[in-house]
Amino acid sequence: MEKREKILHSVINIIIVILVVIGLYMTMTYRSEYMEFQMRGTVSLRYYTVQSNLFAGVVALLALFYQGKATKVLKLMSATATGLTFAVVLFFLGPLYGHWRMYKRANLFFHLSVPLLSMIEFVLLTDVPRKWKWKVLSAVPTLVYGLVYVLNILINGIGERYPNYNDFYLFLRWGWGVALLIFAGIVLISFGIACLLSGINTKVGKLRRKEPCPSQ
């Protein structure tokens, strides 16, 4: 990685960490002016959006001090997780509820800024070996989240009423069959995002290696 790339890498990761901290503060406080279309307080930690952004923040912080192979793979995983959040909001929740609502206040960071920065930083500045296992591994957090979600409902029941409701994504309104299909589809989409990001990363990496050296 060249000096300018190292500087850009550090700057982007610092920005990611700062935005995650700000977004988490807004999410965890009970100040209604900070929130729009989002749960407040510790209950918000159960949501995939918050967890994926926290993961991205931790990985970005780690990348500031260590840039080994493990960190690069974690970069793909965090870009995939936040990329899934970005895609769901852009193509499903945004058209359904209005993009202006989905990108207000704390959601601007967790639905847009952090996911975009995570994906851009991975695609442009991270070199990851072309191995299928890393792409599969990048879908594992989504798989684990879904399994815990389902197991919690099976063990503790659906719950009484929202927001004290274990099926807080309301997948079971259509029955278990449809809910499991949605779950499987989301995991596959997550894997697809990992493949897409990895593919673009590979192409960008080839272009970077072909860049002519500046004349002396």
How does the language model describe each region?
Residues 8-24, 138, 144:
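Alpha-helical transmembrane segments
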Residues 27-37, 90-100, 154-155:
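Juxtamembrane "helix-exit" motif on the non-cytosolic side of transmembrane helices
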Residues 38-47, 99-111, 133-134:
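Non-cytosolic membrane-interface motifs at loop->transmembrane helix junctions
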Residues 62, 69-81, 131-140:
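Interfacial segments of alpha-helical transmembrane regions
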Residues 105-116, 183-185:
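Membrane-interface loop-to-helix entry segments
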Residues 115-132:
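Alpha-helical transmembrane segments in multipass membrane proteins, preferentially the mid-helix core
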Residues 156-200:
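Membrane-interface transmembrane-helix boundary segments in multi-pass integral membrane proteins
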